[in-house]
Each structure stands twice: as structure tokens, then as C-alpha cells.
Amino acid sequence: MKRGHEPKPAFGGAGEAGPGVMAERPLVPACPTGRPGRLQRHLLSGEFDQLRDFRIFESNFVQVTRLGEVANKVTMGVAASSPALELPDLLLLAGPAKENGHLQLFGLFPLQFVQLFVHDESRWQLKVKFRTGRAFYLQLRAPPESRDREFGQWVRLLYRLRFHSAQGAVPFTQDYSALEDDEDDDEDEDRDLPAGELQAMEARLDPQMSELWGL
């Protein structure tokens, strides 16, 4: 993975420091032109008035199984519910509707109920796990020339969410194997479960099956 990039514009794409901005090496929206991403544009469409003002860091993924098989397309983003927050506190999940393929928001969850892991760096994969035990795997969909940089932004975000303190976040230049180690421990627990239970815990993201979230 490429490291040591220059500091990026502010979280949410403002490009300047301001309320809610992450102080050190802030993240930027995953759209190289600075144009709002699909999820941001969807929220601006007027259907979700309470979410219109959220600044979102988002990327496009495909959901994959533990064996790497592609299940469906997913857009995942994080947002801060208040400009006073230094870090995002909400996770948003969206995907194409079965009827017309238009983007559909089918999950908004407090990040306190979610764990994010680096699942496979070489394949740009993250693992998302809820406190209920439900888990799924997402592989980044991005142009080859920007994929490493964009995945690196998610890794930095994971660090901030995991290690942020009143004194500031842990520097992102350090090795992030700790994130992978935590995920490995979680995988060891999974291996002790019968195959049927493992399959039941691996959630398929489907806007028509909201009961999968259990939240």
C-alpha cells in the first residue's frame, strides 16, 4: 500500500479547517473531482431531509463472501451527525434497488455498534461486523490508479475510530498490523462455530431483508 501521502483536504471535502474537521491528516471524499459521491447526491435529492447536511466520506464496494465470491454492489459511507464531532459517528450503507437499479439507502447505524477491520489488504477488503455477530466483507471498487490511496484512507479512518483519544489520533504512518491482528482473533472465534452458524452470521446486504441487521 502506498503511504506517506501529503495531507489531504478536510473531512467532507470542504478543503479548509472548520467545525467537525479532523485535525491531523484529514480524510477527503472518495471522488477525485471533489464532486459529491453517489450516496451524498442521493441524500441531497430530498428524500432524507434530516440527512441532507451530512458530510460523507464514501466509497463503492462489492460485497464478497469469505471465499471471495461477489454477492452484490454496496456503497458505504461514514458521517458525523453533528458539526461539533471530531470523528464520524454514523455508518451508512446503500445499494442498487432491485426494481430499477437506483441507489437505495438501506442502513444507517451508530458506529458504536459496528467494528471495521482490514480483512485482506492485498485485495482491498474490509470486514464489517455488528455487535449482534452479523458480519460481511467488502472489496473496494475504484480505478486502479486511485485504489491504493482510497483504501489507505479507509485504513486511516479505522485507526482514528479505534485509537482516537483526547490527545489526538495515533499517527497513521505507523504499521497498521494491529487492526489485522484484532480481525484475526475474531476469525479464530468464528472457526470454533459450526459451518451452519457461520453461514447464518455472514449477512447478505439486501434492502429487502432488513431483519438481517438485528439492530
Swiss-Prot record:
Region (Disordered) location: 1-20, 174-215
Keywords noted in UniProt: Golgi apparatus
Top-rank lineage group of the source organism: Eukaryota
Comp. bias (Acidic residues): 178-191
Record's signal peptide: none
Matching InterPro entries: GARIL-like_Rab2B-bd
Stretches of the chain forming a coiled coil according to its record: none
Compartment(s) of residence: Golgi apparatus
GO biological processes: defense response to virus; innate immune response; positive regulation of type I interferon production
One Gene Ontology cellular component: Golgi apparatus
The keyword Plastid is annotated on this UniProt entry: no
Pfam families given in the database record: GARIL_Rab2_bd
PANTHER family associated with the record: GOLGI-ASSOCIATED RAB2 INTERACTOR PROTEIN 5A, PTHR22574
Subunit structure: Interacts (via N-terminus) with RAB2B (in GTP-bound form).
Family that this chain belongs to: Belongs to the GARIN family.
Role: RAB2B effector protein which promotes cytosolic DNA-induced innate immune responses. Regulates IFN responses against DNA viruses by regulating the CGAS-STING signaling axis.
UniProt name for this protein: Golgi-associated RAB2 interactor protein 5A
Species in which this protein is naturally found: Bos taurus
Lineage summary: Eukaryota, Metazoa, Chordata, Craniata, Vertebrata
Gene: GARIN5A
